Amino acid sequence: MNIVKTSDPSRPAGADGLNERVHLIPLGHEIDRAVKPFNTYRAERAYVIVVPDNADLDEQMLEKQRHYTKRVCEGLLAVGVRPDVAYCNMFDILDVLRVVSSLIVREKRQGNDVLINMSACGRMTSVPVTMAAMVHGVTAYYVHADRYATGDDAAFEADHGLSIVETGRVEPLYNFSIMMPDAECQLLLCELYRRGQGMTSEDLLDFCHMKGFEGYDKLPPEKKNKSGEYSSGPKNRELLNRTNRKYLHKLEAAGYITRIWSGRRFSVHITDAGRYIACVSGLL
């Protein structure tokens, strides 16, 4: 199996130049629900997304997860699907959004078709998984269980996972549109998320200049007595007005940022809602 770091640069498409069909499988204690869909769906590759080996979990739980990961990868290879293992904190909604969305964006940029199995993980994890699918317009699907490895069937868990799938019924979920901020606003939210602290007006102008946003090619002159601050004047006012009009007012109205004032100066901070948008953007 291949180990994938979600921060790796995009990998080249298939050697034959054809688009691939790629599945994302956030995995808990399941086998059948991860493998049986390939009796219905064609795929060249699948990402098996699991907790990292050094996760802060009981060693017995980690060993159990390694078992399921190994069995699923073996099952995928048996049906001609190449598994790639990616790691994620499956108990952190923001990290699930970040990892799943970045993989979706990576594969879509290569022109590949992406499908997401939202039923092979825990209930809490399935929420951000489905949200990421809808934001990026890819198909999420649910694999129905015929029975569960409990009671008299508990002995089947090691070979089937918690859910026993016999009929292999797969139900696609129908997407509804989730409105996202425009591309430049998403970049700004991601920068706020990365910094983990506020951005001053100078930080904002520098960021817009660095990213090549329209109208920010020339910045105001710096004050002589205060390093890093820009002199007040027509150019400074023009760029601050542009920043407010194009980005800050919209993000504030949506509840994605907040401003903290200190006298006549302010700093911009990302809100909890803004963190969700940054993570689901696929840009982190």
What is the role of each PLM region?
Residues 113-119:
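Short glycine-rich phosphate-binding loop at a beta-alpha junction
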Residues 1-113, 127-284:
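Long, low-complexity, Lys/Arg-enriched
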Residues 121-123:
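Polyanion-engaging groove/track-forming segments
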